[in-house]
Amino acid sequence: MNEINVTLPDGSQRPLPAGASIFDLAASIGAGLAKAAIAGKIDGNLVDLNTPLADGARVEIVTEKSPEALEIIRHSTSHLMAQAVKALFPQAKVTIGPAIETGFYYDFDVDHPFTPEDLEKIEEKMRELAKADLKIERRELTSADAIALFKGMGEDYKVELIEDLGADKVSLYSQGDFVDLCRGPHLPKTSYIKAFKLTSIAGAYWRGDEKRAMLQRVYGTAFGDKKELEAYLARIEEAKKRDHRKLGRELDLFSFNDEVGAGLVIWHPKGAMLRTILEDFERKEHLKRGYDIVLGPQILKTELWQRSGHYENYRENMYFTTVDEQSYGVKPMNCLAHMMIYRSQLRSYRDLPLRYFELGTVHRHERAGVLHGLLRVRGFTQDDAHILCTPDQLDAEIKGVIQFVTEVMGIFGFEFEMELSTRPEKSIGSDDAWELATSALLNALKDSGRPYEINEGDGAFYGPKIDIKLRDALDRRWQCATIQCDFTLPERFDLTYVDADGEKKRPVMVHRVILGAIERFIGVLIEHFAGNFPTWLAPVQATIVTVTDNQIPYAQAAFDKLRAAGIRVQKDFRNEKLGFKIREAQLQKIPYMLVVGDKEVESGMLAPRFRDGKNLESMTPEQFITFIENEVKSYK
């Protein structure tokens, strides 16, 4: 055959010489497309640009503007970094280096920790290798030959990976004298890598196992052009200013203490107030929507965790204690007590749906290496609810939860994205049950009118789920809300209800959180608002500031009125300059400063100014109380 025909995305067919590659196809369409092309898709699968085409293939050309481009660019840049490290530190052993959401990383086994100066040298070497315009070439070897190759190179980690894969053949990529084990695809040449930056260094255990070697993980990022890279780096600098750990200290919200233990938050008065405001908000919103507030114990007998399956599947993340020779597990989740409440009496179909809500504090043994401020802790409180309903009610209940999420995220000013994760290969439950639950989740997503993605096979073994990721002011995604169908617990705990025909039936169960972990959500809020909380959330809503000591009696009376009305107010009557006191209140990000001078004392007024420096009209204490109450009611 001297000629082949391939199908383009628009359905048209294009003839090409036999043996033509995706690059040849791009060149046949136009010089501009050939220049922009970086990879391709054959029958929906991503492949390298120089991959030969078969007759009848459906082909799509991937350019720097394609959705898939960034991952390919970043993955190739991680290989470029590994090549640079091997050139500078020949004794280093390479492990893995994937593309991730914010860029890429590569883990190295080295004799000494990398320094910031090392990063600069590595980055400079990467630029040199990129300019060298090295071809990036793919080849396939038998696993035996690949193992022999990497053993000869002293790359023990690659040998382990190939042995664990258990495949007959593996693919390798080479550029210059550097060879790596990889599925690909990759860019055609190193010169296609134009805009990158190494950002940080961290430690990481090989394969996440604390018993294995500690490696040096180098993080970086890469983009299609320098403009995108510079914009990203500017966002990173802004994120550093907003870091909730930094602001948490500066605003005196919370702390951690090694004497207390890693991952255990100590809430200071202002932080505890912020948390209380959120929890009160949660209770009110749940009661409005027909949830019953419940509370469960912190420890439950180990036999119960064995029955639920947590002991078998989750015990490494649990804490256990023994009381009166009886083993107990500290709860990592709130669901079991809710099961006990349901089982405490006979249930009729007329009782359903039942919606149990608990602000439940749980503890999970997270590895020390993954702990990160409020975003990853060992003790936290979830806005956890479990809905038990009939199969016919499932659609409406899930739609109700999505509407709940939509309304709550709107109050906080967050946009969000949704993903449906479907049945994995290993799962329990009948086909009918999975179909019912997946259909209910999918119908709710469609009815929401919002875009969503489907992650095939990424559900839990006991049921499909919807994950909801909010977007903050820096356009970062945060996993918070989850809606999860569960077939396991109703079965294991023999939950039943009496149907209209008098028969016992199994209820459907939905686990769901709206904000998720309160600690994590507060961390996100701090960074989203940069500590400038809206008035309704601010731990301190106003501070009364005197000009001189002469105004203290009037200012104290005003302070007492505001506090009695429920306004979260503090006072600064120190003998300091007014500008100093105002600046300090601004640094504490307090929404309103109420200045009291001789004029205010004479007129019985307060002189409010917003934290951005804008002056408001003078108000009486009573008027200011009404003003704040209106802001709180409208969630401003």
Curated annotation (Swiss-Prot):
One of its GO terms (molecular function) is metal ion binding. Gene3D superfamilies: 3.10.20.30, 3.30.54.20, Anticodon-binding domain, Bira Bifunctional Protein, Domain 2, Threonyl-trna Synthetase, Chain A, domain 2. It is found in: Cytoplasm. Residues 1-63 form the TGS domain. NCBIfam families: thrS. Its cofactor is Zn(2+). SUPFAM superfamilies: Class II aaRS ABD-related, Class II aaRS and biotin synthetases, TGS-like, ThrRS/AlaRS common domain. The lineage of its organism: Bacteria, Pseudomonadati, Thermodesulfobacteriota, Desulfuromonadia, Geobacterales. The keyword ATP-binding applies. Catalyzes the attachment of threonine to tRNA(Thr) in a two-step reaction: L-threonine is first activated by ATP to form Thr-AMP and then transferred to the acceptor end of tRNA(Thr). Also edits incorrectly charged L-seryl-tRNA(Thr). Belongs to the class-II aminoacyl-tRNA synthetase family. It comes from Geobacter sp. (strain M21). HAMAP family: Thr_tRNA_synth (MF_00184). It catalyses: tRNA(Thr) + L-threonine + ATP = L-threonyl-tRNA(Thr) + AMP + diphosphate + H(+). Its EC number is 6.1.1.3. One of its GO terms (biological process) is threonyl-tRNA aminoacylation. Homodimer. The keyword Aminoacyl-tRNA synthetase applies. It holds the Pfam family tRNA_SAD. One of its GO terms (cellular component) is cytosol. Binds 1 zinc ion per subunit. Residues 243-534 are annotated as: Catalytic. Keywords: Aminoacyl-tRNA synthetase, ATP-binding, Cytoplasm, Ligase, Metal-binding, Nucleotide-binding, Protein biosynthesis, RNA-binding, tRNA-binding, Zinc. This is Threonine--tRNA ligase. Zn(2+) binds at residues 335, 386, 511.
